[in-house]
Each structure stands twice: as structure tokens, then as C-alpha cells.
Amino acid sequence: TVSTATDAKIIASKIANYNHPEYPELDDFGDATLVGNNGATGYFRVDWFTPDGLRTWGDGRTFILGTEGYIELRKYLDVTREGGGDHVFWVDNKGEHYFDAAGKVGFPYFGKLVLDCINRTENAMTQEHAFKAAELCVRAQLQAVKVE
């Protein structure tokens, strides 16, 4: 993990069904705030609110905030700009930076994950890490405030 935390607590979480009242058992929005066992904090949000005008199926942004800068990953597109995704922006004490990662990295993680499943190895991620991520998601869902 980026933070090196090995465990975390869910501090707050919410779920809602904003756009699909005909399916009351489902949620189309969820978020959670976590604090790691090393003091690092995290927030994630998932939703099904992609506007019809967006040229891809979802937004796919990741923000990593640190004490000396931050990184923003734009996986699928840079809104209002031509071209594809795989944009990396970062700001540090030296200035503002940009890297076009399209076609430069490939997808090594997914290949390693498939091989882990086939070979029962732990190269992409450990089983302990995968189970901890799943546990935290379930805990966030179970304790989530249902927004009406």
C-alpha cells in the first residue's frame, strides 16, 4: 500500500440510493473514511452517476495527498481535453508536474494477479492484504449511515 498501513478502522461511511427508487435494496452511492494503524487517513467514494455527456463509462480519478505534495491520477480521461487517459499530475516543493503515462507502463499488476490466482502465489498482493481490503469494505457497508 502507499501508506504502509497494515490495518485500518472505518471512521465514517454512508450509502444511498439516489437515482433508482425502483430498486430499494440497492445503493448507487457509497463512501467511507478510514484511519490506518500508522495514522494515515483515506477516503473513497463510489457511485453510478456518470453523466451521459462523459465520453467514457466512468471518471476513474485517484488523489494521493502527502505532507509535501500530492498526486492526481486520471485513468480514463482529462475532462474537456482531447485524447485518452493515463494522466499523472503531481505537485511538490519544486513545482507542478505532468506525465503522460499512456502506453508507457502497460498492465503488469493484472497479469501478476491472474498468475497469483492460477499459481497460488502472492506477487500482485498478499492474500492478507486482499482479505483486509474486503473486510474493511464489508465493515464500511455494515456501519454505513443510510442517506434517504
Labelled PLM ranges:
Residues 37, 112-148:
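C-terminal helix-rich "cap/oligomerization" subdomain common to oxidoreductases
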Residues 50-54, 80-83, 106-107:
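A short local loop/turn or secondary-structure capping micro-motif enriched for an aromatic residue
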Residues 98-111:
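Active-site loop of classical SDR/Rossmann-like NAD(P)-dependent oxidoreductases
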Residues 61-62, 78-94:
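Short polybasic amphipathic segments
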Residues 69-75:
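Broad, structure-driven detector of short, well-ordered beta-strand segments within folded domains
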Residues 1-59, 128-132:
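Rossmann-like dinucleotide-binding domain that binds NAD(P)(H)
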Residues 47, 75-76:
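Surface loops and adjacent helix of pleckstrin homology
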Residues 37-41, 68, 93-94:
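Glycine-centered tight beta-turn/hairpin loop motif at sheet-sheet or coil-to-beta transitions
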